Structure formats: structure tokens, C-alpha cells
């Protein structure tokens, strides 16, 4: 790894700096495709919200790089004890010595990882070539490509008028089984999907008598004008009937029923070509071509 020149210092982030320094820095750089990190947001307000929901808290997981008193880099992580994984928020660096700063941040952050973390993940726009170079240097290997797709409100004129039912307790068990079949290592379990249901998180389903054919899990963040489809699943025996399209169309109508919501996003694996065609056929546009990379700990 590249040595860090003496003029740089690495520091923890204070509680006050999370909102006044860290969030604006991450969001500003994240708006550039060549710097984009999938786990970071593009506005300070959304970044503050994301940082506020992290576990452990950012003061325990982030390090900042300074040249004198100028902030030039940041890196931290969020974790999931069940998956044993840490997602890296960065590296975000604004300096010509990009790789030296990134290497120093990575070296400083790794000792902060909790014991339950067995694997690290980077998630970056494929145009972020410096992050890719760092991933290779740090021993990460590719975990697959995906697309972040965007759909704006004015595209609803071309969306069919499809409806889906709200999930009822009669199909709770079937949903958990289907979710595990299709997403065995998802960051959300079927039980967690059920627990997340509230005014802003909706599970919509298609059924045939007592049988669950498919579901979509969508959420809205009206305070930020955004919606997001987290999961779309159709039982294998029910495929080829256009049910995925119906579910996504119904989710779009639910999300845009909120006047505050102006745009929605979803993520699709690049290798899942039928799903990508479905989303693009409804009007979604590719915003970020993304790459995940992982490295085991130890």
C-alpha cells in the first residue's frame, strides 16, 4: 500500500461532525459517478439520516483524513451481525494522493471492526476506477455487477393500471418461505420484511385462492421525495404470466400515491436480464452501473 505523507493526519469523527462535516463531504463527492459509492447518499439530509441508523454509530466506525485542517478523505462501515458482514462507506477521497489517503483510511478502519464481522463489502459505480483499483489492492474479489435504476413521476403516464393486494396474516408463512427460497442470503429475512410493515413500508402480493404467487416490498421516504423497491419475487411455478410487471406497476402506483414522492429507485443484478428488461420496459432508466466486491476477514 502507498505510504501516507506526514502532512496528513487521521482522526475519529465527533458526534457534531457527523452532521456538519462527514455527511456533507460524503454526499457532495457521491454525486459524481467517478466517486459514487452505493451505500452513500447524494444529499446531506439523506446522508445524515443514513448515518443516524447505522450500527455501531459513526463515531465508532469512521475515520477522517485531514491535510492540515482541510478534510480530504473519509471511510467507515455499517454492519449486520446475522450476515457477519460490514459494508464500507467509501473510500471517499478528495486529493491528488488519492490512493495513499485511501490506503491509510482502510488500514485505520479495519481494527475498528466488531468481532462478528467475517466479510467486508465494497459497492461502487464501475466508473469509480480508483475505488476498483483500491479493491484489487486490498484483496477484494468481484461479487457481481448490478444496476441502480431510476423512475420519475412523469413516467407514470406509461405504466399500466395494475393493482395488488396488501399482505394479510393468512399469507405470512408463505411469504417467509418464498422469500427464503429466492433470497436465501438477503440482508432482510422474511420475518424482518413482515416486521417492517408500516405506513411507509408496504408488502403487496398477488394470490390465487390460498396460494401466494408473488410479492413486492416497497418503501417511501416522503421527507426526501423518494421511493424504493427493495424486493420483487414471483414463485417459480407462476412465472411467465407477467406477474412481476403487475407487482412493480402496483408498487409504483402506491409509491406515487404520496404527493411528496417525485422519484423511485431499485437495484437489479446485471445478470438478471429478464428483470432488467421488465424494469426498463416500464420506464426505469439506468442511473448507476454498480459493482460489488468482497473480502473475507482473517
Question: Model-found features: residue ranges?
Answer:
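Short amphipathic alpha-helix that is part of the acyltransferase structural core
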Residues: 2-47, 157-186
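Conserved donor-binding loop and adjoining core beta-sheet/short helix segment
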Residues: 37-104, 216-230
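Conserved beta-strand-loop-alpha-helix junction that forms the acyl-donor binding cleft
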Residues: 93, 121-131, 265-276, 293-298
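Conserved GNAT acetyl-CoA-binding A-motif
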Residues: 113-125, 256-267
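Conserved active-site alpha-helix within GNAT-family acetyltransferase domains
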Residues: 126-144, 245, 270-288
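Glycine/small-residue-rich hydrophobic helix-like segments
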Residues: 190-257
Amino acid at each position: 500500500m502507498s505510504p501516507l505523507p506526514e502532512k496528513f493526519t487521521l482522526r475519529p469523527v465527533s458526534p457534531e461532525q457527523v452532521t456538519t462535516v462527514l455527511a456533507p463531504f460524503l454526499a457532495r463527492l457521491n454525486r459524481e459517478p467517478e466517486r459514487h459509492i452505493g451505500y452513500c447518499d447524494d444529499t446531506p439530509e439523506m446522508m445524515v439520516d443514513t448515518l443516524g441508523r447505522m450500527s455501531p454509530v459513526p463515531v465508532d466506525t469512521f475515520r477522517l483524513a485531514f491535510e492540515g485542517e482541510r478534510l480530504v478523505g473519509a471511510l467507515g462501515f455499517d454492519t449486520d451481525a446475522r450476515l457477519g458482514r460490514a459494508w464500507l462507506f467509501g473510500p471517499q477521497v478528495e486529493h491528488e494522493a488519492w490512493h495513499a489517503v485511501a490506503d491509510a483510511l482502510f488500514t485505520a478502519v479495519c481494527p475498528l471492526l466488531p468481532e462478528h464481522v467475517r466479510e467486508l463489502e465494497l459497492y461502487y459505480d464501475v466508473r469509480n476506477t480508483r475505488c476498483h483499483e483500491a479493491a484489487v489492492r486490498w484483496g477484494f474479489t468481484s461479487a457481481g455487477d448490478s444496476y441502480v435504476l431510476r423512475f420519475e413521476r412523469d413516467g407514470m403516464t406509461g405504466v399500466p393500471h395494475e393493482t395488488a393486494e396488501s399482505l394479510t396474516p393468512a399469507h405470512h408463512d408463505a411469504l417467509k418461505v418464498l422469500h427464503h427460497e429466492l433470497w436465501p442470503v438477503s440482508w432482510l429475512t422474511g420475518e424482518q420484511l413482515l416486521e417492517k410493515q408500516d405506513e411507509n413500508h408496504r408488502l403487496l402480493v398477488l394470490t390465487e385462492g390460498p396460494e401466494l404467487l408473488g410479492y413486492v416490498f416497497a418503501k417511501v421516504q416522503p421527507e426526501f421525495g423518494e421511493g424504493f423497491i427493495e424486493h420483487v419475487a414471483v414463485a417459480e411455478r407462476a412465472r411467465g404470466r407477467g406477474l412481476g410487471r403487475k407487482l412493480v406497476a402496483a408498487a409504483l402506483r402506491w409509491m406515487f400515491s404520496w404527493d411528496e414522492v417525485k422519484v423511485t429507485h431499485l437495484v437489479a443484478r446485471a445478470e438478471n436480464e429478464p428483470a432488467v428488461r421488465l424494469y426498463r420496459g416500464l420506464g426505469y432508466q439506468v442511473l448507476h452501473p454498480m459493482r460489488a466486491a468482497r473480502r473475507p476477514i482473517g
